[in-house]
Design a protein with these regions (language model features):
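PP2C/PPM-type serine/threonine phosphatase catalytic domain
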Residues: 1-129
C-alpha cells in the first residue's frame, strides 16, 4: 500500500493560492499531481483548479480500467484530458486575457510509473534518503 501526503499553502506575494496538489490512491495504484497556476496572469487559480477537478473526476471514473492500459495509451488519455482543460479555459476567459498552469503528474501502478510534465514545475527522484 502506498502512503503519502500533500501540503499546499499560499505564498508571500499573492492573497490567492494558485496551486493545487493531490494524491489519489487505491492499493498499489496512485495518481499524484501538482498544478501550479501561472502567477501574474489572469486567474491562475482557475487553471490549476480545473486541472485538479478534472483529474479527480477522471480518477473516480477511470482509474480501475487504467490499471490495465499500456503506459503509452494512458499517457495519451492524460494528454487529452489536459488539452481539454486548456480548451475549456480558452472558452471561458476574456479574449484579451491569458491563464494557465504547469502540471506534474505521476501515475504509479504495480511497480511501473508514468511521469508527465508541462511547464517549469519539477519532479525529483530521491534515493536512499
Amino acid at each position: 500500500m502506498l502512503q503519502g501526503g500533500v501540503l499546499c499553502k499560499t505564498g508571500l506575494k499573492r492573497k490567492v493560492n494558485q496551486d493545487r496538489a493531490g494524491m489519489l490512491a487505491d492499493g498499489d495504484t496512485c495518481l499524484c499531481y501538482i498544478a501550479d497556476g501561472m502567477g501574474g496572469h489572469y486567474a491562475g487559480e482557475k487553471a490549476s483548479g480545473l486541472i485538479a477537478q478534472s483529474l479527480t473526476d477522471w480518477w473516480d471514473g477511470c482509474h480501475e480500467a487504467a490499471r490495465r492500459m499500456p503506459l503509452q495509451e494512458l499517457a495519451e488519455h492524460f494528454k487529452e484530458l489536459l488539452d481539454g482543460c486548456a480548451s475549456q479555459l480558452n472558452r471561458e476567459i476574456p479574449e484579451d486575457e491569458y491563464c494557465g498552469s504547469t502540471i506534474v503528474l505521476l501515475w504509479l501502478n504495480g511497480g511501473q510509473y508514468l511521469l508527465l510534465t508541462a511547464g517549469d514545475s519539477r519532479c525529483y527522484r530521491l534515493r536512499r534518503g
